[in-house]
């Protein structure tokens, strides 16, 4: 936790903690970091790909998606790169590993008719109407929308200033920070 606390955003830090707890420790936790080899990493990725999901998914079984394996790799690579830089390990065993191809699936986007129907459904609640209208028409992240204040909206210019983002740290209280 101390390792990334100063440089990572709270949600990223939580994701990394989960990756370590659920995916790295069960397979590499009993191994001294300086003894981890490229082959160990390759086996880890293969194992995660085919049986890394803890709870069985109705469509995918215990397989993790290629995207998830790539996210775990990015986190592990960064940690081991820092360990190499600090001379804790002689080389980064994630370098040169074969990674799954990121199988990009196009995102499903609402068409105009679907968007109008959705907004009509939430129209009765002013807060949710404004929230979803902003989300659907701007591409802002959820935390950025939650961080908006009326003073950020310039009605004459028709613009929004995105100055802050709201996150929910582990304890559950709201935290206002900078945007990405």
Show which residues each predicted segment covers:
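Conserved long hydrophobic alpha-helices within structured protein cores
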Residues: 37-50, 152-167
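Short, charged, low-hydrophobicity "junction" segments
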Residues: 14-23, 131-144, 174-178
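Generic beta-structure capping elements
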Residues: 46, 99-102, 163-165, 179
């Amino acid at each position: 936790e101390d390792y990334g606390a100063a440089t990572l955003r709270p949600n990223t830090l939580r994701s990394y903690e989960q990756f370590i707890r659920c995916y790295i420790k069960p397979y590499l936790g009993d191994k001294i970091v300086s003894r981890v080899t490229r082959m160990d990493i390759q086996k880890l990725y293969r194992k995660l790909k085919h049986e890394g999901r803890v709870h069985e998914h109705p469509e995918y079984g215990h397989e993790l998606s290629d995207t998830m394996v790539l996210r775990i790799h990015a986190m592990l690579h960064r940690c081991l790169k820092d360990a190499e830089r600090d001379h804790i390990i002689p080389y980064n065993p994630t370098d040169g590993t074969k990674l799954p191809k990121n199988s990009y699936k196009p995102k499903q986007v609402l068409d105009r008719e679907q968007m109008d129907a959705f907004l009509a459904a939430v129209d009765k609640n002013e807060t949710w109407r404004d929230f979803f209208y902003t989300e659907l028409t701007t591409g802002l992240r959820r935390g950025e929308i939650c961080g908006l204040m009326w003073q950020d909206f310039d009605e004459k210019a028709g613009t929004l200033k995105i100055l802050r983002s709201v996150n929910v740290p582990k304890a559950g209280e709201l935290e206002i920070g900078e945007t990405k």
